Amino acid sequence: MRKKDLDDSGMHHIHEFLHGRMYWQYKQEEIEWQDKDYNKFYTMYDFAKKIGGDKVEVINLVPAGTEPHDWEPSTKDLIEMEKSDIFIYNGAGMEQWVDDVLESLDTEELTSVEASKGIKLLKDQDAHEHDHEHNSENDPHVWLDPQNAKYEMNKIKKALIKVDAENKDYYEANYKRYAKECDELDTLYKEGTSKLTKKELVVAHEAFGYLCHAYGLEQMGIEGLSADDEPDPKQMSEVIRFAKEHQVKTIFFEELVSPKVAKTIAKETGANAKMLNPLEGLSNKKIKAGEDYFSVMKQNLAAIKEALSE
């Protein structure tokens, strides 16, 4: 938490980091609390910012533009996590390190939120065929179904209310606003995909299972559930065969992963190579430009409609 001092005008100014409970005992009448909220990658960061608004300080442990499958916390990160009030992570196998870290931390004052817990998880169809670095057989990319995104925002809202009950109405109002946006996004996807005659997507890695499941599409991943899985010759041949068989005209790559393999397959099959963003991370440039979960998901929908209409 941060200590805030009041000046004569009643304005609050951030002064320094302190351990919240100690400071609360002595200065309760002089400060307003701003909960510190740590999360693991862009989507969790975005959801926490939306629900927490100006009542929380949200810190994304994963640097902008970093592929989160590869990331692990540093000693400095662990120290900062122990000082926080809430730690948000996706779960479902996305963060391979999280169980060990939570066991090692002094978590008596830390509320941890596994945002995907309770969602019906899809299985990795290739779990027994490929040696993925993901040691889970579950697909963790739940947020690419807008209804799952709404569910995760609700989990975050409940955690914030638990820690900061005084601002319950504020968090409830923010959740209501963004839950409505999730429903509207879901409607856009249903309407946008319902009349498509083609249903097959070739994607950089198998991150789009929940999106495909929600809207009757099919994905063929060049790589597995982890974006850094390298396709072997057999997988490359299967992808090329699939693309030709289904007359796929667009091979999708991602923002945070080299497009080299996708472009190679596109050249081999006479297709275009374009971006489809799984929202595991965004570049600083896009964040500064105001991009968020909803804007990127709408861009994804436009890309899918174009690809499946060719």
Stretch-by-stretch model annotation:
Residues 1-310:
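Extracytoplasmic metal-acquisition and chelation regions
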